[in-house]
From Swiss-Prot:
This is DNA primase. Keywords: DNA replication, DNA-binding, DNA-directed RNA polymerase, Magnesium, Metal-binding, Nucleotidyltransferase, Primosome, Transcription, Transferase, Zinc, Zinc-finger. It comes from Helicobacter pylori (strain ATCC 700392 / 26695). GO terms for cellular component: cytoplasm; DNA-directed RNA polymerase complex; primosome complex. The gene is dnaG. Changing residue 534 to A: Decreased binding of C-terminal fragment to DnaB, decreased stimulation of DnaB 5'-3' DNA helicase and ATPase activities.
Length: 559
């Protein structure tokens, strides 16, 4: 039997929109997603998916449920089959128990009761309360995150409320000595940070001591409820803001999270004293947010940022790294009133790929030609994880970092790596915080292809042999007007007069090939979400992959 805690963890981790959109075409509508119901015939969309709450409901036929129930209904699977299918898809390990089904309601209730005892103790301990306030925490924040304190009086509270001590030992609240088998408080004399599941249930604690010789932070031990390698501190309060802002700030400490929330950055979370791992990714990816790593600039912080960036870059996640130098961290900046400076820094992260390449270069003695050669091989090996377009974007950066001739990297034109900044803002520290310039936008590419066709309409016969108007997302009307020879169309005239569309002799075929490539790359994303039968999806995906391979080898492929 699959443990209930394992089922809960799966439901809390997976994104219901990602699950359902692989079966049904969803469109955003306010805070929800809508579609025509897959469980009954209808013409107008009445099937609603709530990403934040993790459920779907059809206002037409009444079908409703969570991700598991949807997969069961759509694929006609049993409960266990649907669970195992989702776990396999999202790389989540299910735990099985051969014994009787076990409900964790009592465990959650016990931890909530203990958390309440800790909270009461903190407000009866002026010294510890003053410490937190001196660190910049307001009373409202202390209450919102339900901070507490573990003192000897907690023993009395446990006895007085008749809480199950054996259970509390299992849950890591109490320990038992090896010698006399007496119980003791594991978090004695520590400020307590309750740690919640994504569904806002207490699953464990982090404890901070003010004593110098003891370990500064300790967490609850691993249990059926508490897995520090997959939990994120503050996520239960941040998740709605993450979905709305499409951005998540990952920090290193509990206090960083609380102070960031207090300063208005309510999309901040933290790992539980561990590095970011693949086990965190399913939860971190929910809602497809931009991921900002906000780490200390010391050696440990740089190493953690490097390992996380390697993982996130290979996962093709949007976002980047912000390192805080001179022993600063977000908590310090907020406490010092530097909120605007912090906001500016968070607006200009260094992209994951760029950060990795710079760290790789820094790890070699580049005055030594042999070391430089090793660095080049490592950096190019890393770039092989990405598309040819991305590789071409970052090769000039490698040449700059290694002071290597451009032709060594296969670069013919005299180009250099150009970080991109939004036109509305100018960062204070461009040498550290940069967005990498992306490949030409699809809209620009569509304009360029149509401009070539306007300048030389004999190319139109070539073009229509390979493409149709469905290739264009932004300039479909202009292409249709051109095919219908409506050359006085104002939009076509505007393109003809656009001075920002550089044409090169013999360049049309290259741009046409790139436009077709973009089309098939979109198909790879859209086909799995279509309503086609599984066998047809596989055929279409295979065709798209073959086309992409030929296009990258320089062939033109008809759509």
């Amino acid at each position: 039997m699959i443990l209930k805690s394992s089922i809960d963890r799966l439901l809390q981790t997976i994104d219901i929109v990602e699950v359902i959109s692989s079966y049904v075409n969803l469109r955003k509508s306010g805070s929800s997603y809508m579609a025509c119901c897959p469980f009954h015939e209808e013409r107008s969309a009445s099937f609603s998916v709530n990403q934040i709450k993790g459920f779907y409901h059809c206002f037409g036929c009444g079908a409703s449920g969570d991700s598991i129930k949807f997969v069961m209904a759509f694929e006609k699977l049993s409960f266990v089959e649907a669970l195992e299918k989702l776990a396999h898809r999202f790389n989540i390990v299910l735990e099985y128990d051969k014994g009787v089904y076990y409900d964790h309601k009592e465990d959650y209730h016990l931890l909530e009761m203990v958390s309440s005892l800790y909270q009461e103790e903190l407000f009866n301990a002026p010294f510890f309360l003053n410490y937190l306030q001196k660190r910049g925490l307001s009373l409202e924040s202390i209450k919102a995150f339900k901070l507490g304190l573990c003192t000897n009086r907690i023993d009395y509270g446990i006895e007085n409320k008749g809480l199950n001590k054996d259970k509390l030992i299992e849950l890591g609240v109490l320990g038992k000595s090896d010698n006399d088998q007496k119980t003791y408080l594991r978090f004695l004399d520590r400020i307590m940070f309750p740690i919640y599941s994504p569904s806002a249930q207490v699953v464990g604690f982090g404890g901070r001591t003010l004593k110098e010789k003891a370990a500064k932070y300790i967490n609850s031990p691993q249990s059926k409820l508490f897995d520090k390698s997959s939990l994120l501190y503050g996520y239960h309060l941040a998740k709605e803001h993450i979905y709305k802002q499409k951005q998540v700030i990952v920090t290193e400490g509990y206090l960083d999270v609380i102070l960031l929330h207090q300063a208005g950055f309510k999309n901040a979370i933290a790992t539980l004293g561990t590095a970011l791992t693949p086990s965190h990714l399913p939860l971190l990816k929910k809602g497809d947010p931009e991921i900002l790593l906000s780490y200390d600039g010391d050696k440990a912080g740089r190493n953690a940022a490097y390992k996380a960036s390697l993982m996130l870059a290979k996962e093709q996640r949007r976002g980047g790294v912000i390192l805080f130098e001179n022993n600063l961290d977000p908590a310090d900046m907020i406490a010092n009133g530097q909120i605007e400076t912090l906001k500016n820094w968070l607006s200009h992260p260094m992209a994951f790929i760029e950060f990795v390449l710079r760290r790789m270069a820094d790890s070699y003695l580049l005055d030594d030609p042999l070391e430089k050669d090793k660095a080049l091989k490592e950096m190019l090996g890393f770039l092989k994880n990405f598309s040819l377009l991305l590789q071409s974007e970052y090769k000039p950066l490698i040449a700059t970092l290694l002071q290597a001739p451009l032709h060594v990297l296969g670069i013919r034109e005299r180009v250099s790596f150009q970080p991109f900044y939004p036109k509305t803002e100018k960062p204070n520290r461009p040498q550290r915080f940069a967005h990498v310039s992306s490949a030409p936008s699809l809209e620009f590419l569509e304009k360029l292809v149509i401009r070539y066709l306007l300048e030389d309409r004999s190319l139109l016969d070539l073009a229509v042999g390979y493409i149709h108007s469905g290739v264009f997302l932004h300039k479909k009307q202009e292409f249709d007007a051109l095919c219908q020879e409506k050359l006085d169309d104002p939009k076509l005239v505007a393109l003809l007069l656009d001075a920002n569309l550089p044409l090169k002799k013999g360049g049309f075929e290259k741009e046409l090939r790139l436009l077709i490539l973009r089309y098939f790359e979109r198909q790879l994303k859209e086909i799995p979400k279509s309503s086609l039968p599984f066998s047809e999806k596989m055929i279409c995906l295979k065709k798209a992959r073959q086309a992409i391979m030929k296009l990258k080898q320089g062939e033109l492929v008809a759509i």
